[in-house]
């Protein structure tokens, strides 16, 4: 042990002189402040991205710091320093044994690990890495740093870029720290922001207690105890004693027998005795349990004391007086219509509906409204009334039709040529001439119709030909069409430019006239007229064959 101590002291003395010179040079450059200069240099090197320069600067700082600390701690821990220096001496001697190789490999790994830790801590924690007055470093670390600084000449020759395994290890360390910090920053099981509202239960209706027909659904005092309310209504108060599936509107005695626990709320308009708040008004909401006698008594109290209509949370306001209420009850005895009974319950304040509905009923008057509904006949009765009306006589109806046909003929010929009004009139006349009864009226306007045929456009000619085709089926009207002017106008339509429909109608008119002559329905007495007629027929036949 004594030899080891002497050897350590000798080595310290030999290295004292260059260390002192390095320290003096560093003090001159930094003007007595070593740590800020070293830190500034290291930061500048880190910004340039050169890792080797940063290591060199840190080594200079470490030398100045370690040499001062070795002097103070050499005496306190000679064993640790001696052991570290002994290891260093054995490795610096370049012995060719297996133990020496193992120690060199360990020192190399420790060297790079220590340098990385020093650089990283200095780079990320600027102030903490450059603080030379820190007392956090342990004594064994001081000895190890001394060994590392003295090993610099030997290790500098073997210093090579770090392998991929070391870089991967560093990335793994940084990655683990990053993701662990990320996991701790977020809640893996976040709570939902919105509150899930569970649906309220629906009360099931007891089918045994339901009325069989609407005759049992009444609200006068001698009626059955219960009447059906809104089916499937979602109750606003699930904890109430009686389910809201039925409404009690019988007398007080029957109400006590059927539902003894049901009592009506009778506070004033400005007070509320019920513990539950008023729900949102709907047109078809939960009915209130109320009897006819209780409603009548409340109306009398209001009339005597001058209290405004009641404002119980479970019912609407009742604006009727005693006389109107008794009339309403008498009207309800005469009908079982569910609509009328529902209107009556709204007027009595039994149904908590939308204020607009009750305001409308109160303004119109519930008695007036129900009386008008009762006096309004059903659709079946109105239909029977229409059917049993005496129809007009045949002569009257025929006279009206004749007046209509004459009016249409005058209007048609008076309209401008090819005007929409004229074409509409021709269309109506074509529908009216399907019956032979009105042909004698239209025959009086043949001259105007043939003028339209010869001077009108294609659509006008088509409507006139349809009308004349209907007239040609009647022998009496066809006889009036056999004259030179009419036949000449009919012959003009047979040309290449005429529409096919018009040609077909013209051919049909000639065929009908020919058939009437052949059958003897039309007799031609004048031979000149007959010869002229036959010449026109032969000419038309030749044109048709040519086309």
Curated annotation (Swiss-Prot):
One GO cellular component term of this record is: cytosol
- Basic residues composition bias: which ranges? 1-10, 38-48
Q: Where is this region: Disordered?
A: 1-53
- Pfam families, per database record: Arm_2
Q: Where is the signal peptide?
A: none
Compartments, as annotated in UniProt: Cytoplasm; Nucleus
List keywords of the entry alphabetically: Cytoplasm, Nucleus
What this chain does, per the entry, is described as: Survival and differentiation promoting protein that plays a role in the regulation of neurosynaptogenesis. Induces phosphatase PP2A activity which results in APP dephosphorylation and inhibits BACE1-mediated processing of APP.
Q: Tell me the protein family, please.
A: Belongs to the GPRASP family.
Q: What does the subunit section of this Swiss-Prot or TrEMBL entry state?
A: Homodimer.
What protein name does the entry list? G protein-coupled receptor associated sorting protein 3
| Annotated organism of origin | Macaca fascicularis (Crab-eating macaque)
């Amino acid at each position: 042990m004594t030899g080891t101590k002497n050897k350590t002291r000798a080595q310290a003395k030999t290295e004292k002189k260059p260390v002192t010179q390095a320290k003096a040079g560093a003090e001159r450059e930094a003007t007595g402040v070593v740590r800020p200069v070293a830190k500034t240099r290291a930061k500048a090197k880190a910004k340039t991205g050169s890792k080797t320069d940063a290591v060199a600067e840190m080594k200079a700082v470490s030398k100045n710091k370690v040499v001062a600390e070795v002097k103070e701690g050499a005496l306190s821990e000679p064993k640790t320093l001696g052991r570290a220096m002994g290891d260093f001496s054995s490795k610096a001697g370049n012995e060719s044994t297996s133990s020496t190789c193992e120690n060199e490999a360990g020192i190399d790994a420790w060297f790079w690990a220590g340098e990385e830790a020093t650089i990283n801590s200095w780079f990320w924690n600027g102030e903490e890495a450059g603080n030379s007055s820190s007392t956090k470093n342990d004594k064994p670390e001081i000895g190890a740093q001394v060994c590392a600084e003295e090993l610099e000449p030997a290790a500098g020759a073997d210093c090579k870029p770090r392998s991929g395994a070391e870089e991967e290890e560093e990335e793994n360390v940084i990655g683990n720290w990053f993701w662990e910090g990320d996991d701790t920053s977020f809640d893996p099981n976040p709570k939902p922001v919105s509150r899930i509202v569970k649906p309220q239960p629906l009360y099931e209706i007891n089918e045994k207690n339901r009325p069989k027909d609407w005759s049992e659904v009444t609200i006068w005092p001698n009626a059955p105890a219960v009447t059906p309310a809104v089916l499937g209504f979602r109750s606003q108060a699930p904890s109430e004693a009686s389910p809201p599936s039925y409404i009690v509107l019988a007398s007080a005695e029957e109400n006590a027998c059927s539902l003894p626990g049901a009592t009506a709320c009778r506070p004033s308009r400005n007070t509320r005795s019920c513990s539950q708040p008023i729900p949102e008004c709907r047109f078809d909401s939960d009915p209130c349990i109320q009897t006819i006698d209780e409603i009548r008594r409340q109306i009398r109290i209001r009339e005597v004391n001058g209290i405004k209509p009641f404002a119980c949370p479970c019912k609407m306001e009742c604006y009727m007086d005693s006389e109107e209420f008794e009339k309403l009850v008498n009207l309800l005895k005469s009908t079982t219509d569910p609509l009328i009974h529902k209107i009556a319950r709204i007027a009595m304040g039994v149904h908590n509906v939308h204020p607009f509905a009750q305001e409308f009923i109160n303004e119109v008057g519930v008695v007036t409204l129900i009386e008008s509904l009762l006096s309004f006949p059903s659709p079946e009765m109105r239909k029977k009334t229409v059917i049993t009306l005496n129809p007009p006589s045949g002569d009257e109806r025929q006279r009206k039709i004749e007046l209509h046909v004459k009016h249409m003929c005058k209007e048609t010929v008076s309209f401008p040529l090819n005007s929409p009004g004229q074409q509409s009139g021709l269309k109506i006349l074509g529908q009216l001439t399907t019956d032979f009864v009105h042909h004698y009226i239209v025959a009086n306007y043949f001259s105007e119709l043939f003028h339209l045929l010869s001077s009108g456009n294609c659509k006008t000619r088509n409507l006139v030909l349809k009308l004349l085709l209907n007239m040609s089926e009647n022998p009496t009207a066809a006889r009036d069409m056999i004259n030179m002017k009419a036949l000449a106008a009919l012959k003009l339509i047979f040309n290449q430019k005429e529409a096919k429909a018009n040609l077909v109608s013209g051919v049909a008119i000639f065929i009908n006239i020919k058939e009437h002559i052949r059958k003897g329905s039309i007799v031609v007495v004048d031979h000149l007229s007959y010869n002229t007629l036959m010449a026109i027929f032969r000419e038309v036949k030749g044109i048709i064959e040519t086309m």
